[in-house]
Amino acid sequence: MAKFPITDQGFEKLEHELKHLKHVERKKVSEDIAEARAHGDLSENAEYEAAREKQAFVEARIKHLEDITARAEIINVAKLSGDSIKFGATVVLIDDETEEEVMYHIVGEYEADITKKRVSIASPIAKALIGKSVGDIVEVMTPGGVKSYEVVTIKYEELVF
């Protein structure tokens, strides 16, 4: 069973979802099934079928989250440091073409969210950045072609989820 990195904040978020599913959603689905059963014939009972489908979804998500949390290697980013980019880094880059600054946080695959500038350690941009230092030029293959960036800053700080 392979381990994978995740920030401590990302892990807490997954654990919170898991607890909610186990203690709130699971109970609600059971109540929905019991209520639908009370309506009689189950063979043509749309409410019953919908409740059973939701139960299957909830149970699958619980199993998935249990697997993820069991394999997680929790990393406290605030305790990291260094001059090169690794998991947990917050990196500021300058796009060589547009000269615009962009910032990315390198996180685990289950906490990535590009709208919040959190990129997975397995993403092309993160793979290109790993091991680089301030002043290095990084080339990243994108759907629009190769993009070139200069590394401006590297920080290790807690993320807010």
Curated annotation (Swiss-Prot):
Pfam annotation, one family: GreA_GreB_N
Keyword terms, alphabetized = Coiled coil, DNA-binding, Transcription, Transcription regulation
Entry's Gene3D superfamilies? Transcription elongation factor, GreA/GreB, C-terminal domain, Transcription elongation factor, GreA/GreB, N-terminal domain
Which PROSITE patterns does this entry report, sorted A to Z?
Answer: GREAB_1, GREAB_2
A GO molecular-function annotation: DNA binding
What InterPro entries is this protein classified in?
Answer: GreA/GreB_C_sf, TF_GreA/GreB_CS, Tscrpt_elong_fac_GreA, Tscrpt_elong_fac_GreA/B, Tscrpt_elong_fac_GreA/B_C, Tscrpt_elong_fac_GreA/B_fam, Tscrpt_elong_fac_GreA/B_N, Tscrpt_elong_fac_GreA/B_N_sf
Q: Name one GO biological process term.
A: regulation of DNA-templated transcription elongation
Which domain of life, per UniProt?
Bacteria
* Coiled-coil positions: 43-68
Instruction: Tell me the first and last residues of the signal peptide.
Output: none
> What PANTHER family does the record point to?
TRANSCRIPTION ELONGATION FACTOR GREA (PTHR30437:SF4)
Q: Which family does it belong to?
A: Belongs to the GreA/GreB family.
Matching NCBIfam families? greA, PRK00226.1-2, PRK00226.1-4, PRK00226.1-5
Q: What does this protein do?
A: Necessary for efficient RNA polymerase transcription elongation past template-encoded arresting sites. The arresting sites in DNA have the property of trapping a certain fraction of elongating RNA polymerases that pass through, resulting in locked ternary complexes. Cleavage of the nascent transcript by cleavage factors such as GreA or GreB allows the resumption of elongation from the new 3'terminus. GreA releases sequences of 2 to 3 nucleotides.
Q: What is this protein called?
A: Transcription elongation factor GreA
What gene codes for this chain?
greA
